[in-house]
């Protein structure tokens, strides 16, 4: 096991090193803060959709439509959201901050970090389960938490309106469309014309380093702006959510997946391992931007994301070692 964990550390070091490079570049202003939205836009609208299209097109359609994966992941996401909202709400933390704390606990950084990292560790067979988790979290988990965040201000009517706006935002996001087009290409065994395929391949190859560098830059920007706006969030409001994300969430996914298999759900071992490793990823960096947009305590959210990203450098290889053992 120690040798295996060391080997996994050696695989993951370049991924986290790119995140650290982006953080240092933004923190030192070598990368101007004003340039980060443009870098993020390149990853979100060009490089990452091309990478996801290629994974979708090269993954058997049966893996992309695996209901067992969706059921296990969805149940764990809902349980995590419910638990974090329940224990977070108090006289200082209302629905808005509790909902975004729940989102940052249940939503791993699957798109920017998980796809390249897990395919490097598990191979291309991990792409199907990972893509399913991306779709579920982007469409349902995010929309649910945004709806819950509005309960403070406008009750159930405001929550329903917020959910509709969140779903409209999903439709404007190119990532689900790239996955859908890739799935259709897989189902139809369609191959793109040579020049188009090479162009998409070049953009897709740029996705991994650009996305990881962008994570670090976004974390640095969010931390700096949030600290200027509200000061530093107290540890008691940050650490429990970090522990949920990196410890409770993977354990919950492992337990639910094991129970699902025990009750006869056709969940393969590779898919189960992929789900546990997705849950062990740090929090999604884009939650910070959502929290800022909806007026939540972005200082707290940014700190949770930063802590999970730093801690995952040590915790993630351990989870991989246990899951692969």
Please report, for each region that a protein language model flagged, where it lies by residue.
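Alpha-helical transmembrane segments of multi-pass small-molecule/ion transporters
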Residues: 1-325
